């Protein structure tokens, strides 16, 4: 075997945690260490650790036995080095952070930085590449909204968790003849609500990509009741928008929600349903439950595939790429193609049609 292009690389996890991070870390590090003989520097708490120089040499004992563990052994943060901190009027703080990252990258004698994260993480990775650093990305998020990959690790585990929650809510909704509103994550993309909503038999699914009208939701619930269905399940993505909200600017929506004083979109929808129909309505917000715990077998497999593919890129010196899954094959795509792009649910996605075919309502009157 020829000498690897990468001798030493740093690895960090950035952004929100999700199931599969440790499996991906394990995939990268085991392949890089045992197959290619590379040295690995673990960077704590995402980009913040690289700013502060919080890093250490990893040994096999560090990445053994972590395949099934949730969270991340490296810790994470939502540090965005190219953005000024809250209260900063200019970009000086951001510039200092970027300078610190570049300085510590060289102090640690890194040939490359491997980052595991979502959209913001990969945008930063691309900017660091533009600043002269070698970077490789691995896509993780339960939202499944990273452009360029068919699926991200963490997504399927979250679908499993949300679907199980919907299954459990069916029995209590049936027992009390209630409308149960369950809110799942998905601020700008409704993949999680769509997949879990269909798998869990949701009667109504509300996602950001399809603005809803309360009148259509009410009509669907009342029609179900007239047919003898005494309970209903409404699956709401946290970023779902009413038709009225979809025509507003971001700032206008913020003001409206602040005025309404509902803690989340799920509570707003539940309140409006009960007010309009008189049906007893309850809310469950899954929140961080969706991001925690043991990754599903699918996510362990996907994260391992992504990790070993990243090790291969390190070996070849094929930097500036994000590992992705396309049509069942693991590929590498340029970071520049990924940065600042979002993968949302197309309104004509086959799963939308599947859901409509079994009578699921999206609140749009179709």
Curated annotation (Swiss-Prot):
Pathway: Carbohydrate degradation; glycolysis; D-glyceraldehyde 3-phosphate and glycerone phosphate from D-glucose: step 3/4. Keywords: ATP-binding, Cytoplasm, Glycolysis, Kinase, Magnesium, Metal-binding, Nucleotide-binding, Transferase. It is found in: Cytoplasm. It comes from Spirochaeta thermophila (strain ATCC 49972 / DSM 6192 / RI 19.B1). The active site is at residue 143. This is ATP-dependent 6-phosphofructokinase. The record marks 120 as: Important for substrate specificity. Mg(2+) binds at residue 119. Catalyzes the phosphorylation of D-fructose 6-phosphate to fructose 1,6-bisphosphate by ATP, the first committing step of glycolysis. GO terms for molecular function: 6-phosphofructokinase activity; AMP binding; ATP binding; diphosphate-fructose-6-phosphate 1-phosphotransferase activity; fructose-6-phosphate binding; identical protein binding; metal ion binding; monosaccharide binding. ATP binds at residues 16, 78-79, 118-121. It catalyses: beta-D-fructose 6-phosphate + ATP = beta-D-fructose 1,6-bisphosphate + ADP + H(+). Pfam families: PFK. One of its GO terms (cellular component) is 6-phosphofructokinase complex. Its EC number is 2.7.1.11. One of its GO terms (biological process) is fructose 6-phosphate metabolic process. It comes from the Bacteria. Residues 77-94 have a biased composition (Basic and acidic residues). InterPro entries: ATP_PFK, ATP_PFK_prok-type, Phosphofructokinase_dom, Phosphofructokinase_III, PKF_sf.
């Amino acid at each position: 075997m020829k000498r690897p292009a990468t001798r030493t690389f740093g690895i960090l996890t950035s952004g929100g945690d999700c199931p599969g991070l440790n499996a991906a870390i394990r995939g990268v590090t085991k392949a890089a260490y045992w197959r290619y003989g590379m040295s690995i520097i673990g960077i704590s708490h995402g980009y913040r650790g690289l700013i502060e120089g919080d890093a250490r040499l990893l040994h096999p004992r560090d990445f053994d036995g972590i395949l099934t563990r949730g969270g991340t052994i490296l810790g994470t943060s939502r540090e965005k080095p190219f953005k000024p901190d809250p209260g900063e009027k200019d970009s000086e703080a951001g510039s200092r952070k970027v300078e610190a990252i570049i300085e510590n990258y060289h102090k640690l004698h890194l040939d490359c930085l491997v980052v595991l994260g979502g959209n913001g993480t990969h945008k930063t990775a691309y900017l660091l590449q533009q600043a002269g650093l070698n970077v490789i990305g691995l896509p993780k998020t339960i939202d499944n909204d990273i452009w360029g990959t068919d699926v991200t690790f963490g997504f399927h585990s979250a679908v499993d968790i949300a679907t199980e929650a919907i299954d459990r809510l069916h029995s209590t909704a049936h027992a009390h003849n209630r409308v149960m509103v369950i809110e799942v994550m998905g601020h700008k993309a409704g993949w999680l609500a769509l997949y879990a909503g269909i798998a869990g038999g949701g009667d109504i699914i509300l996602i950001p990509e399809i603005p809803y009208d309360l009148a259509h939701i009410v009509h669907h619930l009342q029609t179900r009741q007239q047919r003898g269905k005494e309970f209903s399940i409404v699956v709401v993505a946290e970023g779902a928008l009413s038709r009225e909200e979809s025509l507003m600017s971001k700032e206008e929506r913020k003001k409206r929600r602040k005025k309404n004083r509902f803690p989340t979109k799920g509570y707003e929808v539940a309140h409006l349903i009960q007010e309009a129909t008189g049906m007893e309505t309850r809310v469950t917000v899954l929140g961080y439950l969706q991001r925690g715990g043991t990754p599903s077998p699918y996510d362990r497999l996907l994260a391992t595939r992504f990790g070993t593919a990243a090790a291969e890129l390190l070996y070849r010196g094929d930097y500036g790429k994000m590992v992705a899954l396309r049509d069942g094959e693991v590929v590498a795509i340029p970071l520049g193609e990924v940065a600042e792009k979002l993968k949302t649910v197309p309104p004509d996605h086959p799963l939308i049609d599947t859901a409509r075919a079994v009578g699921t309502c999206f609140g749009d009157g179709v």
